[in-house]
Structure formats: C-alpha cells, structure tokens
Amino acid sequence: MRLRNKQWAKPLILAHPEMILVRPEKMQGHWQSRFDQARPLYLEVGSGKGQFIVEMAKTHPDRNFIALELQEAAVAMILKKQVALKLPNLQLVLGDGADLTDYFSEGEIDGLFLNFSDPWPKTRHEKRRLTYRDFLRQYQAIMKPDALLQFKTDNQGLFEYSLVSMNHFGMTFDLVSLNLHHDKRVTDNVPTEYEEKFSADGGRIYELVAHFKH
C-alpha cells in the first residue's frame, strides 16, 4: 500500500544517519558494525510502518534486526518510533528489496521476514512479487544455510503462488498454516498493523516458514 508523502520524512531521515541508511551498497559484510554488539542478524523486507520489526527487536534483545523499506514515508514512521525507543538492536534501511545482494554479503543473514507484501495479482507483474524466483535467488545468497524465511499474507492467491514458487525453487517447508490465528502450532506470532486490522474484521491470515536446500 502506497503511503502519502510526508514533508517531515526526508529531514528526519537526514537527521539520524546513526539509525538509518539509504541504499547502503558499501555495508556488505559489515552490518554488525551498525549495532552496539554482534548478534544473529535478521532482516525484514518491506517493513511498512514497523510494528512487527520494532516488537521483534524489543522481544528479542539477543538478535539484531534490519528493517528494509522502499517507501520514504513508511520508513520515516519507523524511524519516529526508533528515535523515541533507541533500540540498540534495530537498524533501518531505505532501499529496494531487488538489490539485496548489493546490500548484504553471502550468508550474512540469519533469518528473513516477508509480511503482507504487495500481491501484484496481474500476470505481467509476476516478477515484482517478493516470492518470485529472482527474489528467492537473492534471499538464498544472503542467508546462512538452513536460515528460515517466514512469509505472512492475507492474500490466498499470493500464498498459493508462493508455495509453488518456493517448491519449484527446491525449498523445504517447515510450516504451512492456512489459518495462522487459529493454528495451535504457532505460539509466538507477532502481528503487523495491517494484520491486526484485517484479522479483527474476520480475515484469514496465511503463513509459511521455509528454508533453502544447500
């Protein structure tokens, strides 16, 4: 979902280079230097307004987190929260998920989250889906062997597409849930803003957890 431009977004981003990087091509292999100490490194691609990644950083102080978001207005909303919270294990990136191998080195990421990505339902836009094979190839390159990819969506079509895409890519599924909020196997779900609204209206949430075969 596109957010309206916010006049305060760019000045806020420019004022906090210690918390946010813009298209960080020179950070490959050096991400731990952005945190107060080295910890396992987790990446969310498409962080939206940031409720999920902020809560994860608060809940798991033993991990480092990176929130990557393409929209300036959205990442600025996360930055507003981080300016107030000053979480030592959270860094923000204004950048494109299509450029991950420019931002991260091979095997640098311990886990990756895709939450409520744009479904791009038209066939001609298939290559823009974050579970298209070209994206999967980048995830595989930057993730450690057996690192987990967690994917959540409310869009049944995108979920089914993602299952097929990942299966064709040779991934192994650790969890497939057709109704996440009623799945007793999942006890540690952290919802996004959108997820809370959608499920409160009776919507169904789909989730899969998978890893690459090496």
From Swiss-Prot:
CDD domains for this protein: AdoMet_MTases (cd02440)
Q: Where does substrate bind?
A: 122, 154, 192-195
One of the entry's Gene Ontology molecular-function terms is: tRNA (guanine(46)-N7)-methyltransferase activity
Catalytic activity entry: guanosine(46) in tRNA + S-adenosyl-L-methionine = N(7)-methylguanosine(46) in tRNA + S-adenosyl-L-homocysteine
Q: What is its EC number?
A: 2.1.1.33
Q: What class of enzyme is it?
A: transferase
Cite the active-site annotation.
118
What SUPFAM superfamilies does the entry give? S-adenosyl-L-methionine-dependent methyltransferases
Under Gene3D superfamilies, the record lists: Vaccinia Virus protein VP39
> Where along this sequence does the record place binding of S-adenosyl-L-methionine?
44, 69, 96, 118
Which pathway is this protein assigned to?
tRNA modification; N(7)-methylguanine-tRNA biosynthesis
| Superkingdom, natural source | Bacteria
Q: Which GO terms describe its cellular component?
A: tRNA methyltransferase complex
Q: Quick one: where's region Interaction with RNA? A: 124-129
A Pfam family the protein falls into: Methyltransf_4
Q: Which UniProt keywords apply?
A: Methyltransferase, S-adenosyl-L-methionine, Transferase, tRNA processing
* Biological function: Catalyzes the formation of N(7)-methylguanine at position 46 (m7G46) in tRNA.
Would you identify the family this protein belongs to, as annotated?
Answer: Belongs to the class I-like SAM-binding methyltransferase superfamily. TrmB family.
Q: Which HAMAP family match?
A: tRNA_methyltr_TrmB
From the Swiss-Prot or TrEMBL record, give the protein name: tRNA (guanine-N(7)-)-methyltransferase
Species per Swiss-Prot/TrEMBL record? Lacticaseibacillus paracasei (strain ATCC 334 / BCRC 17002 / CCUG 31169 / CIP 107868 / KCTC 3260 / NRRL B-441) (Lactobacillus paracasei)
| Gene responsible for this protein | trmB
